[in-house]
């Protein structure tokens, strides 16, 4: 009967997943029902990333009309690998002086403990990157990525093409026990036999090691997409490549320290499919879709995220748009308040109008419904071919008029001119809504397609998120919808660390003294 091996890992410090400050440790249990010749027992801590990308039919035809054979493009990166021998002990191993003679181990139960150092900060694969390696990160920005799609095998059991293509990228960490048996005396079995047992685990680095560095050319403006242009993004497409109206210029590939990397993440991930040939990027031709490109600006030290399009008003001359103003909407941690006053997320939302003030003040403009979506874009890269996957999570959908409050969410009596007098604005007080002000992000620690909600970027996998705020309006009895996209938003599955001021010591009155009578 074969030996029975079990691996018991010590729990992580936070009780949920292993992080940068943890040391992987545990016990290997070995049960033998009969004597066995064992040369050594090793414990291996390792992690790897793997991607598979495909080329769609339009790329299989060259300019001369010949058909290029299709093939899968695979990429494998070793993120880390550490080995520790637990049997025989060091003093015995050193005394063997290279001898391959095995040990005869009697039947019974044996336990071997192991412990590794803290997880490295950078992946091991960086030393293998060359000038021809095209990656999402530079050497300086590369960090050990979190676990991703560790349950990818379950996706293949589901009749769902979305999950099938989503499983083409994975980051897996494991502890592997390897038992090397003694050499067989038979001439037809001349090699050592290996027995292996594997235990996977979830690893998510500290937030500081998950932060995605901003693109050097995109600090001044963000690309926003209209609801029409991202229609296919709301429900994940079944095709290999989802439709997009962005094309990637060749300037977005840059060589840093001898390694090519994608300089403009946003354009690259939104492109339908990308083929890199001799440093030149060609994007798949897509149908023409109207989109609106909006840029952010600063107002009183706050970033302003405008709606992707303006809505015409009934007088035929005026229009309105929505603006979200925030100082810190680019990063959201789990259990962060989304609409609460002081949250710096959606607590400052304004309706900005252009037109005649007398005409505007007579209109009946009422917010009716609100929907907040979290949009995921996951991109896999392999041998110059990138495939994108889009999906959407509905965070909340609410009827704004279901619960009446003492003060309306939008009071046009408070309309005022903006700082330069060219427009009028009025605050939409979503922070005063009794339900929205209590809403926190990802309170239940939701797993989307088997993965916690976190943004990350590694050599060949990039997972980014954006927020989409949809508001349905009633304007003089006519229903219209506004859309604001915050793209991208850094998402963390950890709870934000709140630095609390140390409480002052309690005041203790000094003792009183009385003179003793002489």
Curated annotation (Swiss-Prot):
InterPro entries, sorted: Arrestin-like_C
Main localisation: cytoplasm
Compartments it resides in: Cytoplasm
Alphabetically ordered keywords of this record: Cytoplasm, Endocytosis, Isopeptide bond, Ubl conjugation
GO cellular component annotations of the record: cytoplasm
Subunit (UniProt): Interacts with RSP5.
Function text: May regulate endocytosis by recruiting RSP5 ubiquitin ligase activity to specific plasma membrane proteins in response to extracellular stimuli.
Assigned protein family: Belongs to the ART10 family.
Name assigned to this protein: Arrestin-related trafficking adapter 10
Gene, per the UniProt record: ART10
């Amino acid at each position: 009967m074969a030996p029975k091996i079990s691996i018991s890992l010590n729990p992580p410090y936070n009780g949920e997943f292993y992080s940068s400050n943890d040391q992987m440790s545990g016990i290997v249990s070995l049960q033998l029902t009969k004597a066995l010749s064992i040369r050594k027992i090793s414990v291996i801590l390792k992690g790897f990333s793997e991607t598979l990308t495909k080329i769609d039919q339009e790329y299989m035809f060259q300019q001369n009309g010949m058909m290029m054979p299709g093939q899968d493009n695979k990429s494998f990166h070793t993120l880390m690998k550490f080995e520790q021998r637990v049997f025989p002990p060091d003093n015995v191993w050193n005394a063997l002086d290279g001898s391959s003679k095995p040990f005869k181990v009697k039947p019974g139960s044996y336990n071997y403990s192991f412990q590794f150092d803290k997880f490295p900060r950078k992946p091991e694969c960086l030393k293998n990157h060359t000038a021809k390696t095209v990656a999402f990160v530079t050497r300086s920005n590369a960090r050990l990525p979190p676990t991703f799609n560790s349950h990818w095998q379950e996706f293949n059991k589901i009749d769902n093409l979305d999950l099938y293509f989503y499983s083409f990228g994975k980051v897996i960490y494991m502890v592997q026990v390897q038992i090397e048996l003694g050499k067989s005396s038979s001439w037809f079995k001349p090699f050592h036999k290996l027995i292996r047992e594997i235990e996977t685990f979830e690893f998510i680095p500290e937030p500081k090691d998950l932060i995605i560095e901003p693109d050097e050319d995109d600090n001044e403006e963000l690309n926003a997409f209209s609801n029409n242009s991202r229609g296919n993004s709301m429900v994940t497409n079944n095709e290999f490549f989802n439709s997009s109206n962005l094309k990637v210029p060749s300037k977005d590939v840059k060589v840093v320290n001898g390694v090519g990397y994608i300089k403009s993440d946003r354009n690259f991930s939104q492109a339908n499919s990308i083929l890199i040939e001799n440093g030149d990027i060609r994007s798949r031709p897509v149908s023409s879709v109207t989109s609106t490109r909006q840029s952010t600006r600063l107002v009183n030290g706050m970033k302003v995220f405008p709606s992707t399009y303006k809505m015409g008003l009934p007088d035929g001359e005026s229009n309105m748009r929505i603006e979200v103003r925030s100082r810190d909407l680019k990063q959201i941690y789990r259990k962060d308040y989304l609409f609460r006053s002081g949250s710096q997320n959606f607590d400052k939302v304004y309706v900005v109008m252009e037109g005649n003030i007398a005409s505007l003040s007579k209109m009946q403009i009422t917010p009716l419904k609100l929907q907040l979506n979290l949009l995921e874009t996951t991109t896999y890269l392999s041998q110059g071919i990138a495939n994108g996957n889009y999906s959407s999570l509905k965070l909340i959908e609410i009827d704004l008029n279901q619960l009446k409050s003492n003060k309306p969410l939008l009071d046009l009596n408070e309309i005022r001119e903006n700082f330069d007098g060219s427009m009028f604005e009025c605050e939409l007080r979503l922070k005063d809504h009794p339900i929205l002000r209590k809403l926190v992000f990802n309170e239940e620690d939701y797993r989307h397609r088997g993965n916690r909600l976190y943004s990350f970027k590694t050599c060949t996998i990039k997972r980014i998120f954006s927020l989409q705020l949809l508001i349905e309006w009633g304007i003089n009895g006519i229903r219209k919808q506004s859309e604001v996209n915050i793209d991208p938003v850094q998402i963390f599955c950890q709870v934000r660390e709140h630095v609390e001021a140390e409480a002052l010591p309690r005041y203790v009155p000094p003792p009183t003294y009385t003179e003793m009578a002489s």
